[in-house]
Amino acid sequence: MRTEPDGRWSRRAGLMLAGALAGALALLGSVRAQGLGLPDLVERAKPSVVLVGTYRETDSPRFTFAGTGFVVGDGLTVVTNAHVLPDPSQPADGRVVQVHTWQGGREWQARAVRVHVVARERDLAVLRLEGGPPVPALTLAAGPPPREGSDLVFMGFPIGGALGFAHVTHRALLASITGLVLPQVRGQALSPRAIRALRDGPMDIFQLDAIAYPGNSGGPVFDARTGEVVGVINMVLARGTRESVLSQPTGITYALPVALLHPLLNDLPR
């Protein structure tokens, strides 16, 4: 005797199948995001991440690398750390700030720049390219900061030219969003930079679970999910403030949130 399947079971089975299919598609999407998203992000970001240093006719080599920068806005604005630039308190010695942009392979192009603004209390600087075509620009995150535990990526030139100038990418976890200066630090343990930071009010920074090296300073930190820039690697500001209580600074990497950068870009083309 032939029996007809129960309608309720058919509907339930259909819902189960649809749920399983949706879960599989979500998992596939996650795998694709993790497996293909990062290579795409790296490929897209490399032309926008630049060498920052100084040029002097009598130096050998004439270009001296100092740190990483990245292009935003209209393709003529470069962001980096203030400490990457020559110290303005020192006598002029003929050095000028210069940026080198990647042309593919091992080719780099020197570009003249002018310093637009320097915020030393935030250790951020904004440069403007002079002459030549715009450079592909990165997108700055405009919303709230990423949540602790988020997957991040940062790019730069660790160890500078010692290993050759090649973009290097690192994965990182946002381990903590923490204050720049510990409130319990005694006044005599603070550097002048830390005292200025306290005077200017609280400032949150990102603590990452990856190690950045000299040369990474000024480089972009990306949200691995969206590809937007959420921070700027900084290897100096936190060492002179948050870690001033330590006799031996740690290998922890810090980054400045882009919220500190946005006010410096208000009068520039977007």
For each of these PLM feature ranges, what is it?
Residues 40-41, 88, 116, 130-166:
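Active-site substrate-binding loop(s) of clan PA
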Residues 73-120:
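Catalytic-histidine neighborhood of serine endopeptidases
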Residues 16-27:
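Bacterial N-terminal signal peptides
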Residues 30-33:
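Sec/Tat signal peptide C-region and signal peptidase I cleavage site
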Residues 45-62, 130-138, 168-266:
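Active-site region of chymotrypsin-like
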Residues 9-16:
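N-terminal export leaders
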Residues 72-73, 91, 146, 224:
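Short, well-ordered loop/turn sites that connect or cap secondary structure elements
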Residues 36-38, 55-81, 111, 218, ...:
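A conserved glycine-rich beta-strand in the N-terminal activation segment of trypsin-fold
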